[in-house]
Amino acid sequence: IGVSAGSCNAASFIGKNYRRQHDITINYCNDKRYMSIQSAFKNGQYINLDWDFGELTYEILPLDNETYENSGTQLCAVATNALTGKPEYFYPKDLREVGCPYLKASCALPIATKGVEIGGQTYFDGGLTDSIPLKRAFEDGCQKAVVILTQVRGFVKQPIKQQSAVRRILKKYAAIADAVLSRHEMYNNQLEYVFDMEKEGSCFVIAPAEDLHCSAVEKHTDKLEHIYQLGYAQGKLNAQKIKEFLKG
C-alpha cells in the first residue's frame, strides 16, 4: 500500500524496476519539463504530472508492466477525493491504462499540481487524508505490516500557519483545504497508532536515522542522493530482521 510518491515506489518495486524512482528523482528533478516555474506557466502546474506519467513513464523510464502484472502482488494506491475530502483506495491490476491515473492521483499535491480526474471525480494526493495507511492494511487482511516512515522517531507535525492563504488558493476545493489544514492532527494520530502497533508486535517500523530536511519539491541532487543512500543502508540493516518478523 503506497501513498503519494510511495505508490510509485511500490509500483516500481513490484515491477522490479528497483532504481527507477532513484533515477527519476535524481536525474529529472531539475528538468524544466518535470518540475519548474516554466512548467507552472506553460502547463498550469509546477510539477508536471502529465509529463511524469506520460513521456517519462512510457518512453524514457517505463514501468515493467508485465513483471508487475505477473508478480502476484497487489498494490493499493491512496488518493483523496476532492469533493468529500476523504481517502479512497485503488487497486490497479496492471499499469496499462494511459497516464497511470491511480498513481498520478496519489501524487497530486494541491497547489503544486492539478487534480486528477478518475471516473468523473477529481482526486489529490492521498497523503492529505491517510498519510500512513496502516489501519487500511489491516482492514485489507494484513496481519503484519512493515511501515516505512519519512520522518525520524519523535517527530511531531505542526499546523500550517498561512491558513487564510491556503483557503484562498484552494477556494475551488474547500474539502481539500480542510484536509491540508487539519493534516497535522491526522498525521500525529497515525504516528501514535503506528508505534502502538509496533509495541504490540503487529508492525515493523523503519524510520530515518537522521532528520532529512527534504522538501516535497527538492532540487538539490546531492541531498537527494544522500537520502537515497541512507534509505538503502536502512534497508540492508533491517532486511534480516524484517524476514524474521514476517515469519514469526
Functional labels for PLM-detected ranges:
Residues 144-202:
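Helix-centered, glycine/charged polyanion-binding patches within enzymatic domains
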Residues 62-63, 130-134, 189-192:
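Glycine-rich, charged/polar anion/phosphate-binding loops
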Residues 33-37, 170-171, 209-218:
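A short small-residue
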Residues 70-148, 153-167:
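Active-site gating loop/helix substructures
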Residues 1-59, 91-105, 149, 153-161:
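Patatin-like phospholipase
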Residues 39-47, 86-91, 121-124, 178-181:
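Flexible, glycine/proline-enriched loop segments at strand-loop-helix junctions
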Residues 60-74:
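A short alpha-helix-loop-beta-strand transition element characteristic
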Residues 190-248:
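C-terminal helical/tail subdomains of lipid-metabolizing enzymes
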